[in-house]
A protein has these predicted regions:
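Acidic/histidine-rich, surface-exposed loop or edge segments in extracytoplasmic proteins
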Residues: 50-69, 174-180, 285, 327-330
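Zinc-dependent metallopeptidase catalytic helix centered on the HExxH motif
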Residues: 150-262
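Bacterial N-terminal signal peptides
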Residues: 8-18
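Bacterial N-terminal signal peptides that target proteins for export
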Residues: 1-7
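Bacterial lipoprotein signal-peptidase II cleavage site
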Residues: 20-31
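Acidic/His/Gly-enriched intrinsically disordered linker/tail segments
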Residues: 214-298, 310, 320-366
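N-terminal low-complexity, Pro/Thr/Ser-rich intrinsically disordered segments
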Residues: 31-63
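Zn2+-dependent metallopeptidase catalytic core
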Residues: 63-158, 191, 195-198, 205, ...
Length: 366
């Protein structure tokens, strides 16, 4: 059978930062309307805004039975650390697949039993979706990990896959290679991934509407969504590691250091903007369907670093996100940045042409 780490409970009032208010919706949810509605995953919701569960906020990690028992507590401790740093807004479920198909199937069954018991999703319908071939189904994370191992490539993925209609942040992940000793990768990479995914929860948590189109618009362009998650994950992990607040993980065969990681991103930016995406500008990378959307991660991370350098004294948590739903993304961004989006794009374009030492100079030290 699958294993689940113990539930860790924290009071929400102790952790909310900067007067944060809203909770997030899911990209899985259809446009919200008052009354009962059907969501893309087959479940139903009865409100047009996210409903925060009463009581304390729980953080739960569920791991497939073929994973080492240490994996769940490490991820849970990391999520709790991220929650202390950025705020814990509403319940978190983090589901982690291994490599074994049977163990993966058992984890899907556990997930669907949980949904059915809570009255959120019929067990049979849940199994049809999550054990099937749909994109982002739970079992797809097991399959991707197994395929990566068979091919000798340490590919991995994780995602925040909902669920606003249930009032929780739900994540799924392929096997964390560094935490499990495969390919001799540093466990810090997996820690960073957890931070990256949790920042997506933070982003969603300031949006109350369940209207899917409105949520997508309020989240902002790809470079901001993914760049923000990547940069905040990098600095969040580095800061808490320096303070001794993160669990110990396998070192792997090479060090995972903040400045080095940001340097690698500069190589990716320089290559990307001189290759197939030559002539593109940062603010043109708005959609995941864009062939250049992968640049949104590296260029976006540096854009957020540049933004925070230009707005010294401000933070996204205190000064941007609390105004987001009222103002809309672009107005909130321009008010935060103190300049128009076009002016920001021009400034970033000039900044990114600087030498590597000049670019690295804006980064914090840990």
């Amino acid at each position: 059978s699958t294993t689940a780490s113990a539930i860790a409970t924290l009071a929400i009032t102790a952790l909310l930062l900067g007067g944060c208010a809203a909770v997030e919706g899911s990209s899985d949810a259809d446009a919200g309307t008052t009354g009962s509605q059907k969501n893309q995953d087959g479940s139903s919701t009865t409100s047009d805004v996210v409903q925060i569960p009463e009581g304390d906020i729980t953080v739960e990690v569920f791991t497939a039975s073929d994973l080492d028992p240490s994996v769940g507590p490490i991820i849970q401790d990391t999520l709790l650390a991220a929650g202390e740093l950025w705020g814990l807004y509403w319940p978190v479920e983090y589901w982690v697949m291994g490599l074994d198909p049977e163990a993966g199937q058992e984890l899907v069954e556990q997930y669907c039993e949980r949904r059915d018991k809570a009255g959120q999703f019929d067990y049979s319908d849940c199994m049809d979706r999550e054990a099937g071939d749909e994109q982002h189904s739970m079992i797809s994370y097991q399959r991707q990990g197994a395929e990566a191992l068979a091919g000798g490539q340490p590919y991995g993925t994780a995602g925040r896959n909902g669920d606003a209609n249930w009032g929780l942040h739900r994540f799924a992940s392929t096997i964390p290679w560094g935490l499990t000793g495969y390919f001799d990768l540093p466990g810090e990479e997996d820690i960073k991934t957890v931070f990256h995914e949790y920042w997506h929860a933070v982003q969603h948590s300031f949006i109350q509407t369940l209207d899917r189109d409105q949520r997508d618009e309020l989240m902002g362009p790809v470079w901001f969504v993914e760049g923000g998650a990547e940069y905040m994950a990098q600095i969040g992990r580095a800061a808490l590691r320096a303070e001794g607040k993160l669990p110990e993980v396998p070192a792997g065969s090479w060090p995972f250091e903040f400045e080095e990681q940001m340097s690698y991103k500069l190589f990716g930016i320089d290559d990307g903007f001189s290759g197939d995406c030559e002539g593109r500008e940062l603010t043109s990378i708005t959609e995941y369907s864009d062939p250049c959307s992968s640049l949104g991660y590296d260029a976006g991370a540096w854009a957020i670093a540049y933004l925070l350098d230009q707005t010294a004294g401000k933070t996204l948590l205190a000064d941007f996100y609390p105004t987001l739903e009222e103002k809309g993304w672009q107005q909130a961004f321009e008010d935060f940045a103190g300049m128009s989006l076009a002016e920001f794009n021009d400034g970033f374009s000039k900044f990114i042409e600087k030498t590597t030492p000049e670019r690295l100079a804006i980064l914090p030290s840990f």
